[in-house]
Amino acid sequence: MTGATILVADDDAAIRTVLNQALSRAGYDVRITSNAATLWRWIAAGDGDLVVTDVVMPDENAFDLLPRIKKARPDLPVLVMSAQNTFMTAIKASEKGAYDYLPKPFDLTELIGIIGRALAEPKRRPSKLEDDSQDGMPLVGRSAAMQEIYRVLARLMQTDLTLMITGESGTGKELVARALHDYGKRRNGPFVAINMAAIPRDLIESELFGHEKGAFTGAQTRSTGRFEQAEGGTLFLDEIGDMPMDAQTRLLRVLQQGEYTTVGGRTPIRSDVRIVAATNKDLKQSINQGLFREDLYYRLNVVPLRLPPLRDRAEDIPDLVRHFVQQAEKEGLDVKRFDQEALELMKAHPWPGNVRELENLVRRLTALYPQDVITREIIENELRSEIPDSPIEKAAARSGSLSISQAVEENMRQYFASFGDALPPSGLYDRVLAEMEYPLILAALTATRGNQIKAADLLGLNRNTLRKKIRELGVSVYRSSRSA
């Protein structure tokens, strides 16, 4: 829609000049101002086909002006620019009815493209205005990578689209899921999280979908599942790559038909739940290995969102440190200041545990060190002390990997820790043996390209015994091509 009039408001003269020149070259009529009062006068008079405005101006904040604009001219697209590149800025822009949000500095080509799309669209449905009552900062970071995540989340807030979050362990996948829920249309419903890796495989279906009385040994009463608990809200499926095949089939039915049955039940139950899934695995590789359903993958991967590792957004570390120090202060710990050399050293660290590792370090420093200022020397000592010192970790460091018994011991330690002061459900011995059998049989079948005779010989099992275990454990049998 060349020839359209663009109203530009920014108190920075250089930005006004750049936008005036770029938009004029693109064929638009441009009117520029440095204040909100003039912008509002133009809009109230019916001038302009689109607005490009900064958030902070000398006389009024654009977020205060936006509701008046949307009330007076609900079809007028408003693009918001801001140097305050935070998650809440993106959310406020969306909630107040902005067409889009651009963090400064931005790409002019991208801006012109957004303007073209906005002007080409039919009249837009007015956005629901929300009370700006939450000033918390659920996500922290001003890097380019985080800006893109903020923009995607802002666009998803008022939808029920299924989201697949990928990223390394500790990157904040559950935080993103919670932010999407807390600031989205389902905020008044429950947020329910379940970690597939922390639940025994034979209990996952019951945990997800619930079970009826007498559905299996030990089911003495009816139990609600996570889907029922999350009704009207959001269900976060963490470590989705660890979900067994039977549970995957049930989940696919929910996504396809919007209903499920409890374990042992016959009556379908309608489901009104937004699903957000997360994994640190390569699910496409799992599909090729026969461990994950391809049709389920595409049902879950409607909107993919990859969270970057902390080493790829090291510029966010000072903001994250300040955030964690503030959290520690709220918990009654002393306020600490990190000197610049300490921060630079932290920015250079690879952080294999990502944001979770950084948070643990900051909490440890605020709790254990009497110094008001955290120096480079303190950080060096702490990072050096992270060299493994337990017998298991020392063995792993020497060999480069954990032995099977060490891996089991470490896994069981984490498993018991996940229950806090409580104990896991009874029957742990049989569950652990089953957990060991599954990967062992799968590895043997993979090594023998699905040949059960060779796999049985490799395992030292009778062929019929192997077949029985394959059925009981739900091991996926597949054959790989011999040719490269």
Curated annotation (Swiss-Prot):
SMART domains: AAA, REC
InterPro entries reported for this sequence: AAA+_ATPase, CheY-like_superfamily, Homeodomain-like_sf, HTH_Fis, P-loop_NTPase, Sig_transdc_resp-reg_receiver, Sigma_54_int, Sigma_54_int_dom_ATP-bd_1
Biological process according to GO: nitrogen fixation; regulation of DNA-templated transcription; regulation of nitrogen utilization
GO cellular component, one term: cytoplasm
Pfam families assigned: HTH_8, Response_reg, Sigma54_activat
Primary location class: cytoplasm
Boundaries of every Response regulatory domain copy: 5-119
Modified residues (4-aspartylphosphate): 54
Keywords: Activator, ATP-binding, Cytoplasm, DNA-binding, Nitrogen fixation, Nucleotide-binding, Phosphoprotein, Repressor, Transcription, Transcription regulation, Two-component regulatory system
Annotated DNA-binding residue span(s): 452-471
Domain annotation Sigma-54 factor interaction: ranges: 139-367
Post-translational modification: Phosphorylated and dephosphorylated by NtrB.
GO molecular function: ATP binding; ATP hydrolysis activity; phosphorelay response regulator activity; sequence-specific DNA binding
Record-listed ATP binding positions: 167-174, 230-239
Cell location: Cytoplasm
Function: Member of the two-component regulatory system NtrB/NtrC, which controls expression of the nitrogen-regulated (ntr) genes in response to nitrogen limitation. Phosphorylated NtrC binds directly to DNA and stimulates the formation of open promoter-sigma54-RNA polymerase complexes.
Full protein name: DNA-binding transcriptional regulator NtrC
Organism: Rhizobium meliloti (strain 1021) (Ensifer meliloti)
Gene this protein is translated from: ntrC
